[in-house]
Regions:
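Structural signal for interior beta-strand "rungs" in well-ordered beta-sheet cores
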Residues: 1-186
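Terminal amphipathic alpha-helical/low-complexity segments used for targeting or macromolecular assembly
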Residues: 1-5, 10-11, 16-17, 53, ...
Length: 259
C-alpha cells in the first residue's frame, strides 16, 4: 500500500507487500525488501538498501550525507539495513564517506527514537541502540550489544559482542565483549544477565570471568596481559578466546578501565 502523497523515485525498487505512508520520500536507486513499512514523513535517501521486514518510523532519515567537512557529496556510497530491523522516530543513519563504502546495520536491530548512527559504522545483529544515543563515524558494534540512552561513542571505537553501556556514558575507548561500561570509559565487570539470557553455560561464563580477571585484575597493559592469557593454554572456549582476542584486534590500543 502506497499513500498517494508519498514521493517515490522511478528507479527505486520496492518488494512485495511494502507499505509507504503519507509524505514519505524514497529517492533514486533505493532498494526496499518485502514487507517493509516506511511511515509518514520518513526519508530513504538515494542508494539505500533495506532488507525484508524493516520498519522505518516517522521522520527518520536513512542514508543522509555524512557530517564530515571533507566529504564530497558526489561520492557514491550508501547505507544497508538488515532484515527485521526496527528504526524508530527521528533516527538518522548516514551513508559512508568513501567511494563504494557502506554504513551497515545488521539484522534484527532495534534503534530507538532519536538515535544517530554516523558514517561508516557497522553494527552486528540483535543490537539495541536506545533513545538519543550517538555513534561517531566508523564505530563497530558487536552482536547483541546494548547501547543505552544518551550514550556518546567516539569515532573508531569498538563496542564488543554482548557488551552493555549504561545511560549517558561517554565512550572514547574500546569496550570488550560482554563488558559492562559506564560513566566515562569505565568498566564494572561483565554482562552476566545478558550472557545467561543468550543461553551461555555456567562453564563458559566462568571461563569468560577468568579471562576478564586475567586482563583487568593486575595493573598492566591490557594487550600484553591478553597475549599472556592466550599463550597460557588455560582458555579453550570460543567465547573466552573471543574476549581475549578483542584486545589484540583493535587499531587504537585503548580500552575502558575499572575504577
Amino acid at each position: 500500500v502506497i499513500h498517494p502523497s508519498a514521493q517515490i523515485h522511478p528507479s527505486a525498487r520496492l518488494g512485495n507487500a511494502v507499505v509507504v505512508g503519507p509524505l514519505a520520500i524514497i529517492e533514486a536507486n533505493v532498494s526496499i525488501g518485502n514487507q517493509c513499512e516506511i511511515s509518514a514523513h520518513a526519508i530513504i535517501k538515494k542508494g539505500s538498501v533495506l532488507g525484508d521486514k524493516v520498519k522505518v518510523d516517522h521522520f527518520a532519515v536513512i542514508g543522509g550525507d555524512p557530517q564530515d567537512i571533507h566529504f564530497n557529496p558526489s561520492t557514491s556510497s550508501n547505507v544497508s539495513i538488515g532484515d527485521s530491523t526496527v528504526i524508530r522516530e527521528h533516527v538518522t543513519i548516514h551513508r559512508a564517506t568513501s567511494e563504494g563504502g557502506t554504513t551497515i546495520i545488521g539484522k534484527n536491530n532495534f534503534i530507538m527514537a532519536g538515535a544517530h548512527v554516523a558514517h561508516d559504522c557497522n553494527t552486528g545483529n540483535h543490537v539495541i541502540l536506545a533513545n538519543g544515543c550517538m555513534l561517531g563515524g566508523h564505530v563497530n558494534v558487536g552482536d547483541h550489544a546494548f547501547v543505552s540512552g544518551g550514550v556518546a561513542v567516539h569515532q573508531f571505537c569498538r563496542m564488543g559482542k554482548g557488551s552493555m553501556t549504561s545511560g549517558n556514558a561517554v565512550i572514547t575507548e574500546d569496550v570488550p565483549p560482554q563488558g559492562l561500561a559506564h560513566s566515562r570509559n569505565k568498566i564494572s565487570g561483565l554482562n552476566l544477565v545478558g550472557m545467561r539470557r543468550r543461553g551461555l553455560s555456567n562453564e563458559v561464563i566462568a571461563e569468560i570471568k577468568k579471562a576478564y580477571h586475567w586482563v583487568y585484575a593486575p595493573a598492566g597493559n591490557c594487550i600484553a596481559l591478553a597475549e599472556s592469557a592466550l599463550k597460557s593454554g588455560e582458555f579453550t572456549t570460543p567465547e573466552a578466546l573471543e574476549f581475549l582476542d578483542f584486545f589484540l584486534g583493535g587499531k587504537r590500543g585503548r580500552f575502558v578501565q575499572p575504577e
